Amino acid sequence: MTAVRAVVFDIGGVIQDSPLHAIARYEADHGLPAGVINRAVVAAGEAGAWSRLERGELTVEAWCAPFERDCRAHGITVDARRLMEYIAAAGRERPVMLRAVDRLRERGLRVGALTNNWATEAAPTGPHPIARHFDALVESRAVGMRKPDPRIYRLICQHLQVEPAETAFLDDIGANLKPARALGMRTIKVDDPEQALRELGAMVGFDLL
């Protein structure tokens, strides 16, 4: 088996706390069925407001009205601005993951981040504040494509100057892992950060905890 020369991390749900938890809190606080917002996003598809936001085609301000329409089409009423406030308040970094990133780089591996995101007031056009931890960062809103588009996985590998078969990829969403596996990347689904790092440590041959 080809040795792992690079590791790629998702940000939300891996390096930072998951925005899905913030969405779940919004649903609970507003009497919505669990998971219904994600189902509305999936139903709207690549032409939906959420996908367009993550591809950088909409600002957050311009996204609100079409996203609320997508939700109404799915039978729910959502205050998009309030939902985004929940998400913005939830992005705490996970120190255990950042320590692992540092250790990987110290041992000579290339380390990248691959994230579906959108422009914010804190970083409207510049790089993500967490970029300094990585050798390369690919943001969906900056490149006009989003996971699970296979092209975005190839792009991060190009930035890291490695082949997909030389790369491990960590994400908290199964649908984002499937295209990576199809390209030959080794994948880890992150439910528990420490368990994920144990799996990654076994792949790279040294402890990350």
Where are these regions (language model features)?
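Structured helix-beta-strand junction loops
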Residues: 107-108, 133
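N-terminal helical cap/lid subdomain that shapes the substrate entry/recognition surface
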Residues: 2-99, 106-107
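Asp-based, Mg2+/Mn2+-dependent phosphohydrolase catalytic module
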Residues: 1-5, 9, 102, 114, ...
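A generic structural motif
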Residues: 108-109, 185
